Design a protein with these regions (language model features):
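Helix N-cap/capping motif at the beta->alpha junctions
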Residues: 35-44, 67
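Active-site beta3 strand of CheY-like receiver
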Residues: 50-57
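Alpha4 helix (beta4-alpha4-beta5 surface) of REC/receiver domains from two-component response regulators
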Residues: 69, 91-108, 115-118
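Conserved acidic carboxylate
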Residues: 11
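Short amphipathic alpha-helix used as the core "switch/output" element in two-component signaling
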Residues: 44, 68-81
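Two-component/phosphorelay signaling modules centered on CheY-like receiver
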Residues: 14-35
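C-terminal output helix
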Residues: 111-122, 132
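Receiver (REC) domain active-site loop signature in two-component systems and cognate sites
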Residues: 62
């Protein structure tokens, strides 16, 4: 049996927060670590937390600090850089830039729960099989 992984959701849209939270709650090996409404709030929570999430699902288009800026800050922070980040957006044109900036995967919104479940399970299994530093080298696109 795999150990449950915590997922930090960074999403400004309340309906999307509810959708992703419900989908993640339905995944046997995943729990919600917390929710942030924008990149600034996410960085504050991560930098002030003693226990970090196992992975982050983050929207790109958000106020204050957008998802790409937040991803860049996470990857520059020695304490946070190894947390796998999955970027979420309606704009598939952002997938390549997300990869270049260090995201492990990209999911096109609106997503469906089946796709989200498959991606989370895939990442949990990959992390279980391979050391996370090696696993972070692969990038996956889903839509």
């Amino acid at each position: 049996m795999l150990i449950s992984k915590s997922i930090f959701l960074v999403e400004d849209d309340k309906e999307d927060q509810e959708f992703f939270t419900e989908c993640i709650d339905d995944i046997e090996n995943a729990t919600i670590y917390g929710v942030a409404n924008n990149g600034r709030e996410a960085l504050d929570k991560l930098e002030n937390s003693t226990k970090l999430p196992d992975m982050i699902f983050m929207d790109i288009n958000m106020p204050y600090i957008n998802g790409l800026e937040c991803l860049t800050a996470i990857k520059k922070n020695t304490r946070l850089k190894d947390i796998p980040v999955v970027m979420l957006s309606t704009d598939t044109g952002q997938a390549q830039l997300s990869c270049i900036l260090g995201a492990k995967a990209f999911i096109k919104k609106p997503a469906d729960c089946k796709l989200l479940h498959a991606k989370v399970e895939q990442m949990i299994n990959l992390d279980f099989i391979i050391d996370s530093k090696i696993a972070n080298q692969s990038f996956q696109f889903a839509y």
